[in-house]
């Protein structure tokens, strides 16, 4: 994953590595009953192990400094470096890895494609998927 605070290594450099998600953790060590109990304890909102790459362009259309946050395989929130207003960046990510976007100063929720959660989809005809970040409209 690029831009992760303190990481310094982009996904392009990590594309050949394999990360084991929770779905691979207990299969050999636990029996069926224990595995079901372990799965029940995992967060519902988390990344799932996917080998399908998705090219993404994250665009900050808000006047705020944006903090992108990736939910890892265990549901832990991992913040990345901030994105200035009017700027964008391109990343290679994996399909079904969820992202949230927050105001870097206030931690207010920001919308991405008019919803609170962004889950990359498959690229169609080789075109990147856009994640357009905007402010919430309060009625």
UniProtKB/Swiss-Prot annotation:
Cited InterPro entries: VHL_beta_dom (IPR024053), VHL_beta_dom_sf (IPR037140), VHL_sf (IPR036208), VHL_tumour_suppress_b/a_dom (IPR022772)
Subunit structure: Interacts via the beta domain with the ODD domain of HIF1A. This interaction is independent of prolyl hydroxylation of HIF1A.
Organism, scientific name: Homo sapiens
Misc: Has little or no E3 ubiquitin ligase activity as it lacks the alpha domain required for nucleating the multiprotein E3 ubiquitin ligase complex.
Tissue/organ expression: Abundantly expressed in the placenta.
Signal peptide start and end residues: none
The family this protein is said to belong to: Belongs to the VHL family.
Pfam families attached to this UniProt entry: VHL (PF01847)
Gene3D superfamilies tied to this protein: von Hippel-Lindau disease tumour suppressor, beta domain (2.60.40.780)
SUPFAM superfamilies given in the database record: VHL
Name used for this protein in its record: von Hippel-Lindau-like protein
Annotated spans, Beta-domain: 54-135
Cited function: Functions as a dominant-negative VHL to serve as a protector of HIFalpha.
Disordered: region residues: 1-22
Top-level taxon of origin: Eukaryota
């Amino acid at each position: 994953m690029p831009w992760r605070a303190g990481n310094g290594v982009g996904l392009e450099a990590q594309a050949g590595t394999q990360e084991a998600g929770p779905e691979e953790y207990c299969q050999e060590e636990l029996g069926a009953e224990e595995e079901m109990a372990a799965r029940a304890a995992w967060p519902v909102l988390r990344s799932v192990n996917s080998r399908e790459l998705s090219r993404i362009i994250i665009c900050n259309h808000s006047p705020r400094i944006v903090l992108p946050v990736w939910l890892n395989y265990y549901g832990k929130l991992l913040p990345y470096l901030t994105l200035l207003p009017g700027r964008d960046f391109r990343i290679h990510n994996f399909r079904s890895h969820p992202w949230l976007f927050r105001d870097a100063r206030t931690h207010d929720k920001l919308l991405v494609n008019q919803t609170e959660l962004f889950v990359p989809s498959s690229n169609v005809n080789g075109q990147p998927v856009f994640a357009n970040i905007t402010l919430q409209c309060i009625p």
